[in-house]
């Protein structure tokens, strides 16, 4: 029997978010709907989830001592990693001492870098993947590129949102790609993965939910990425029955191996009826933002239910839906948005502004969600709304 206490009392059920971006913000909101006390943690102040949490902390989550000290201070019932850049070896130790890591410390540890999860999928589970090799220095990197062949994709083994990711088209790109990968890694310089191209027809995210009643799948989500970062997603993406069955089989094998309860974003390449494993995130996925309108229960609501041990009787898709990221480019900590009336004049359009405190370079600051009679119309509707939003980047005020 699930028991939830009253927030801010000695019987509170406490959840700690490690990572407090826009995805963590939605998880925090869903947990609070069930009366869970939410503690938001990140490496910077005023992160999106901090703005809706009961309280917040700023620490270096890659520092195992800081991480342990905070967790032992707060004693949360649930530790919920929302990003990769965490001292996951310490999470393994904390789990062994009795803390509950969602979905599991093993899942967080294996997926914090691309090497752990790729070796699990390809070498232990025998799943089809793109050709790959790992490199820890420039010499081994050059050998890996030669072995895989060009064109190939280079990624830091630990990064997100496409940071440090590039494509090598010729020998002249090798040194540039290595430098870029070293600059883009979440934990600084380190290993990279070199991946051969899969000649795929499309790629999808299959949101896979492990919960008290078993394993459930959301409808496939199609998406467009630019520079390795999500820009547009839509649901349901059409797949043949054979390909869908293969995708679900791969997703179930990977998530069973990772263990625990919660939502997993399983990324797959599809060519005809053949399906190749790409990556998995043991948490809500950015392409899954579309589920805020496309399903009766969003990926965030599903994650909350699963980790709390609550039932998920039915995941219902509500029609052709799309999301388009609101990408802002510039340098400012005084960002404003206007012309929202134009963006929201259609009855089937919704907007989420994430409340991120600043932008330096390019940053996803919001998302538009739309539904229509078909996917093309939903994507056009969402894009039109994004295009109508005016972003104002005010000059930073110098502190005396």
Curated annotation (Swiss-Prot):
Molecular function GO terms recorded: ATP binding; magnesium ion binding; phosphoribosylglycinamide formyltransferase 2 activity; phosphoribosylglycinamide formyltransferase activity
GO-annotated biological processes: 'de novo' IMP biosynthetic process
The protein, known as: Formate-dependent phosphoribosylglycinamide formyltransferase
InterPro entries listed in its UniProt record: ATP-grasp, ATP-grasp_carboxylate-amine, ATP_grasp_subdomain_1, PreATP-grasp_dom_sf, PurT, PurT/PurK_preATP-grasp, PurT_C, Rudment_hybrid_motif
Binding of N(1)-(5-phospho-beta-D-ribosyl)glycinamide, residues: 22-23, 82, 286, 356, 363-364
Keyword ATP-binding: yes
Pathway the protein takes part in: Purine metabolism; IMP biosynthesis via de novo pathway; N(2)-formyl-N(1)-(5-phospho-D-ribosyl)glycinamide from N(1)-(5-phospho-D-ribosyl)glycinamide (formate route): step 1/1
Record key words, sorted: ATP-binding, Ligase, Magnesium, Metal-binding, Nucleotide-binding, Purine biosynthesis
Reaction catalyzed: N(1)-(5-phospho-beta-D-ribosyl)glycinamide + formate + ATP = N(2)-formyl-N(1)-(5-phospho-beta-D-ribosyl)glycinamide + ADP + phosphate + H(+)
Protein family according to the UniProt entry: Belongs to the PurK/PurT family.
Residues the record lists as binding Mg(2+): 267, 279
């Amino acid at each position: 029997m699930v028991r939830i206490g009253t927030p801010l009392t000695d019987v509170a059920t406490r959840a700690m978010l490690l990572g407090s971006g826009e995805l963590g913000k939605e998880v925090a909101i869903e947990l609070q709907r069930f009366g869970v006390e939410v503690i938001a943690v990140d490496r910077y102040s005023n992160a999106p989830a901090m703005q809706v949490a009961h309280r917040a902390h700023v620490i270096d989550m890659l520092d195992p001592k800081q991480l342990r000290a905070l967790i032992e201070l707060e004693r949360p019932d649930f530790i919920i990693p929302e990003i990769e850049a965490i001292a996951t070896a310490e999470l393994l130790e904390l789990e062994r001492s009795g803390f509950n890591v969602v979905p599991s410390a093993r899942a967080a540890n294996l997926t914090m870098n691309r090497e752990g999860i790729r070796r699990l999928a390809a070498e232990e589970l025998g799943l089809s993947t793109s050709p790959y090799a790992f490199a820890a220095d420039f010499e081994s990197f050059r050998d890996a590129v030669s072995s895989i062949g060009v064109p190939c994709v280079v990624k830091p083994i630990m990064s997100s949102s496409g940071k440090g990711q590039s494509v090598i088209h010729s020998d002249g790109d090798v040194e540039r790609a290595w430098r870029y990968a070293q600059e883009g890694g979440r934990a600084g310089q380190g290993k990279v993965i070199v991946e051969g191209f899969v000649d795929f027809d499309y790629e999808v995210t299959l949101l896979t939910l492990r919960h008290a009643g078993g394993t459930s799948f959301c409808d496939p989500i199609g998406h467009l990425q630019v520079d390795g970062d999500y820009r547009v997603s839509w649901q349901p993406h059409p797949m043949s029955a054979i390909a869908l069955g293969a995708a679900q089989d791969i997703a179930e094998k990977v998530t069973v191996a990772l263990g625990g309860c919660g939502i997993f974003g399983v990324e797959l390449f599809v060519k005809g009826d053949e399906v190749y494993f790409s990556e998995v995130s043991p948490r809500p996925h950015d392409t899954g933002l579309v589920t805020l309108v496309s399903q009766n229960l969003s990926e965030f609501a599903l994650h909350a239910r699963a980790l709390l041990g609550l039932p998920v009787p039915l995941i219902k898709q509500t029609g052709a839906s799309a999301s388009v990221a609101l990408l802002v480019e510039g340098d400012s900590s005084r960002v404003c948005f206007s012309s929202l009336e134009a963006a929201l004049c259609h009855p089937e359009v919704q907007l989420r502004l994430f409340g991120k405190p600043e932008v330096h370079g390019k940053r996803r600051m919001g998302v538009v969600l739309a539904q229509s009679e078909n996917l093309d119309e939903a994507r056009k509707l969402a894009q039109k709304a994004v295009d109508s939003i005016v972003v104002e980047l005010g000059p930073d005020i110098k502190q005396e």
